[in-house]
Amino acid sequence: MAIQKKHGKGRLDKWYKLAKEKGYRARAAFKLIQLNKKYGFLEKSKVALDLCAAPGSWCQVCAETMPTNSIIIGVDLAPIKPIPKVITFQSDITTEKCRATIRSHLKTWKADVVLHDGAPNVGTAWVQDSYNQAELALHSLKLATEFLIEGGTFVTKVFRSKDYNSLLWVCNQLFAKVEATKPPSSRNVSAEIFVVCRGFKAPKRIDPKLLDPRSVFEDVAGPAPNNEAKVYNPEVKKRKREGYEEGDYTQFKEISASEFINTVDPIAILGQYNKLSFEQPKNGDVALAALDKLPETTEEIRLCCADLKVLGRKEFKLLLKWRLKVREIFGFPSKKTQKAAVDEEVAVVENMDEELRIQEELQRIKEKETSKKKRERRRENEKKQKEIVRMQMNMTAPMDIGVEQEGPRGEGAMFRLKTIDQNAALNKIAKGKMAVIKETEKPKDYDFGSDGETDESDEEADRLEEELDNLYDQYRERKAAADAKYRAKKARKENGDDEWEGVSGDEEKGSDDDDDEELEVDSSDDDSDSEDGESGKKLITDLDGQPEEKDGLSKRAKNFFSQGIFAEIPGLLEEPESEEEEAQEAELVEAVEDLKVTKKEKKEAKETKAKSKKAAEESDDDDDFEVVKNNEDDDWENVEKKKKNGRPDIDIITAEAMTLAHQLATGEKTSYDVIDDGYTKHAFKDRDGLPDWFLDDESKHDKPHKPITKAAAQAIKEKLRAYNARPIKKVAEAKARKKFKQAQRLEKLKKKADMLAGDDGMSEKEKAASISKLMASVAKKTRRAPIKVVKAAGSNKGLQGRPKGVKGRYKMVDPRMKKELRAMKRISKKK
């Protein structure tokens, strides 16, 4: 296996090798050396503070370059190995503990240079990484303002992003000179740049918002477009190529002329859109048709609306005047009519509407309830505060603490029946294993040979069977709550794909009964109907004894809606049905039954029509094309896709289906054989009266196993392998991008060729030569220049920078590298 050579971040990096040769802990040391060579700030400094210093290469450079007896402090989250003449400690630069440690080391000194070469953990979205880096640089700047001497230097690393300008603006407020540079040792593929800030102003007071990331990097909304300048001064307007608008990537914008008449801001439409259209939409527009037929809509107006971008100030004024005239004709309110209406409204006082009165009443009730809750909360807090004060003053024993005695629901919550009865607590108590079993007077006989009277009166067996069904239903509910596939299967069983043919009278009656069904453990089948109405009994009984009505309204809600303001609202309270409504309901049921009969007749007519049509097509062999009529009788809910020959498009995905299809195709089986195979001992099994748990378990084993062939299984495997062999999304997108770029190049080439072909100053020979030259330039593949190998010997030994006489890409080689490559090959062979 060939060894992959690494470029950029690999071992062959020049600065990496130089760092190893000179004993630096990281290649980043050369970045500081080159920055100091350009600006010269380390030689004059006596105190240096290195933030995010690990592994300590910048501290090494400071110790070598700065004068003797200088104070160098390095801090980082990661531990730093000891460095001579350098004080290092481990801390977070955003905490107060780090500031205190730095103060203890500096004492009364101030730092001449503050360095920051840190970066957060990257790997998420680029926007998040760049923001984290800018935020870290701002924190280091905040720390530098506390310890930097007046006229000092601050060097930090930042990423090129949208937050870069904001950070640079903050640096300009605090320093005299701010420059951004990129040293040669920084990789070209990296987005990092270094900002060197010199001449610290040392202000006496700094606004906290100036060093707050939330304020500095806050997104500022762009200025609103000046549409008035586009309309009233189109000649002076300067185009600013700022790209597309957010969410709108179309260059040509068109709007209906009727919308221009109806809008309240016509200048914005004239400044943003390209055309006012008079074309009718598909569904039709009455206002646009009337606008098109008005005599005020002259030919000049139509020409001006055709292209708004070429109009001048005069034409825009003409369109605005035309709009005012049309609005006056259509009866839209103008400025004069609005002023008159305002004067009249001042004089006339209208009565409050019924709807507004209801809304105000509801708002008042809501505010009253909110204030009541606030008062209760305040009293509870005051009570807790008093108890705490009593405890602190040793006025009570710990066992008498009121807060713990009362519990989370307050004092006496255990004996509040209203709280207990919430969320159908009574039904939960009476359900499941906690149900009360009624005592029987006489033991029951479970022998199968007993007489008929004892079998019919066997209430205990019925109760046990009902309890078993109840427990099985609870087990299924728990299983459904844990398994998503089970829930989906259950939903498919309940909601079939049958055709909906309306609601009959019997179904309407049964739907209400199904919603109210509940499992009663301590009741039999005979008295279950009588106890259905009593299942809603509560622990608290009203003294007035009025039963709750079926409309779902409580007594309090009913009293509220019985006020006079709700009397005139139709349909709010239930009214008894009249005889006419009952007759209409009976007619509706009859119509649904008739509809079912007519649908069956239509279906039979369709089959006969299809047979006759097929016979006619077979007889007519001279036609070259097939005429397919639109079948208006197709059901819109039939989502099954059909082919042109009328057969359903079925995807074969199992080996059993593939075996059956192969047998039908080869003639081993006919359709009648398949129908005969369906008549088995499992086809007409009597399932009435069997419990659900037995049917669910039996359904796993009562299905016949159909044989499959080896060829069918192999065909299904090949089909799945073809599905899996499809390219991934990234590969498909890359191919699509490549194809799109090729289409763009061909489009540009076509335009250039058309321009050359239409040039009258060139002969046909010159045109052909130019077009062939263009084609050759497109087909020509650009080859990268080969990398030149330069031996690090003689004059090139220990050379820093590009060797003399070498252009383009190159790499330095030496005997040491050759030995390392041989050793790597030898090690890889052993593995």
From Swiss-Prot:
Family: Belongs to the class I-like SAM-binding methyltransferase superfamily. RNA methyltransferase RlmE family. SPB1 subfamily.
UniProt-annotated stretches for the region Disordered: 442-556, 569-644, 790-816
E.C. designation(s): 2.1.1.-
Keywords: Coiled coil, Methyltransferase, Nucleus, Ribosome biogenesis, rRNA processing, S-adenosyl-L-methionine, Transferase
Catalyzed reaction equations: a ribonucleotide in rRNA + S-adenosyl-L-methionine = a 2'-O-methylribonucleotide in rRNA + S-adenosyl-L-homocysteine + H(+)
Regions annotated as coiled coil: 349-396
Highest taxon of source: Eukaryota
Protein name, UniProt field: AdoMet-dependent rRNA methyltransferase spb1
Binding site for S-adenosyl-L-methionine: 56, 58, 76, 92, 117
GO molecular function: rRNA (guanine) methyltransferase activity; rRNA (guanosine-2'-O-)-methyltransferase activity; rRNA (uridine-2'-O-)-methyltransferase activity
Record bears the keyword S-adenosyl-L-methionine: yes
Gene coding for it: spb1
A biological process from GO: rRNA methylation
One GO cellular component term noted in the UniProt record for this chain: nucleolus
Positions with biased composition (Basic and acidic residues): 474-486, 534-554, 593-617
HAMAP family xrefs: RNA_methyltr_E, RNA_methyltr_E_SPB1
Residue ranges, compositional bias (Acidic residues): 448-470, 496-533, 574-592
Compartmental location: Nucleus, Nucleolus
Quaternary assembly: Component of the nucleolar and nucleoplasmic pre-60S ribosomal particle.
Record keyword Coiled coil present: yes
InterPro entries named in the record: RNA_methyltr_RlmE (IPR050082), RNA_MeTrfase_FtsJ_dom (IPR002877), rRNA-MeTfrase_E (IPR015507), rRNA_MeTfrase_SPB1-like_C (IPR012920), rRNA_MeTfrase_Spb1_DUF3381 (IPR024576), SAM-dependent_MTases_sf (IPR029063), SPB1-like (IPR028589)
Role: Required for proper assembly of pre-ribosomal particles during the biogenesis of the 60S ribosomal subunit.
List of catalytic residues: 157 (proton acceptor)
